[in-house]
């Protein structure tokens, strides 16, 4: 692994050359090491199994009413431009027999956000993993994010926010269930 890190540091130095900066100037000397180290966190989702995050479930005391965790902050990196996008995710599900600790829902968002990603796929992955592991009656995930590829390059629209949703099970079949969830996350 150390050889890969050294090779990546040299790649970062090559980027400095490509953009026309001086790889030997004081401010850039340790930048390659810092960038590679930051990737340990930024891309840590590749080293985690999202199903394991939801592995501890509780069956006693499981309810059959909607469970909602909203405004889960996240940061991710766009797979198209390797620029950040960030925002909030709200998750709702209706348990059948299993519930999970709420911190696990936030960790589930984190594991998918910490990968090269597109928001549409991330939103669906969160919902699909909930359905697979918890086997609820339904799940719904809404993500809202600002994409730096839209803000600092391209069309440069600073106020743009992308909204995606993934709707599964009862949420897909029943408009009232969707409306209840949307009511919870709007407040």
UniProtKB/Swiss-Prot annotation:
Top-rank EC class of the record's enzyme: hydrolase
Reactions catalysed: GTP + H2O = 7,8-dihydroneopterin 3'-triphosphate + formate + H(+)
Single GO molecular function: GTP binding
One record GO biological process: one-carbon metabolic process
Highest taxon, organism lineage: Bacteria
Any Pfam family the entry gives: GTP_cyclohydroI
One Gene Ontology term, aspect cellular component: cytoplasm
Keywords: GTP-binding, Hydrolase, Metal-binding, Nucleotide-binding, One-carbon metabolism, Zinc
Keyword tRNA processing: no
Binding-site residues for Zn(2+), renumbered to this chain: 78, 81, 149
Known pathway: Cofactor biosynthesis; 7,8-dihydroneopterin triphosphate biosynthesis; 7,8-dihydroneopterin triphosphate from GTP: step 1/1
EC code(s) of this entry: 3.5.4.16
Keyword Isomerase appears in the UniProt entry: no
Subunit organization: Toroid-shaped homodecamer, composed of two pentamers of five dimers.
Family: Belongs to the GTP cyclohydrolase I family.
Xref: HAMAP family: FolE
Record's protein name: GTP cyclohydrolase 1
Protein species of origin: Wolinella succinogenes (strain ATCC 29543 / DSM 1740 / CCUG 13145 / JCM 31913 / LMG 7466 / NCTC 11488 / FDC 602W)
Gene name tied to this protein: folE
């Amino acid at each position: 692994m150390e050889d890969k890190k050294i090779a990546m540091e040299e790649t970062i130095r090559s980027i400095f050359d490509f953009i026309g900066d001086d790889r030997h100037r004081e401010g850039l000397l340790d930048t390659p090491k810092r960038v590679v180290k930051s990737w340990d966190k930024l891309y840590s989702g590749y080293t985690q199994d999202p199903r394991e995050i939801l592995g501890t479930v509780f069956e006693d005391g499981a309810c059959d009413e909607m469970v909602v965790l909203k405004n889960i902050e996240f940061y991710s990196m766009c797979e198209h431009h390797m620029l950040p996008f960030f925002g909030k995710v709200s998750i709702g599900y209706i348990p059948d027999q299993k519930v999970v600790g709420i911190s696990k829902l936030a960790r589930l968002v984190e594991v998918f956000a910490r990968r090269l990603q597109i928001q549409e796929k991330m939103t669906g992955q969160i919902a699909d993993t909930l359905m697979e592991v918890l086997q609820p009656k339904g799940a719904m995930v809404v993500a809202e994010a600002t994409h730096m590829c839209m803000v600092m390059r391209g069309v440069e629209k600073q106020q743009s926010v992308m909204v995606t949703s993934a709707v599964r099970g009862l949420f897909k079949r029943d408009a009232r269930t969707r409306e209840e969830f949307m009511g919870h996350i709007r407040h």
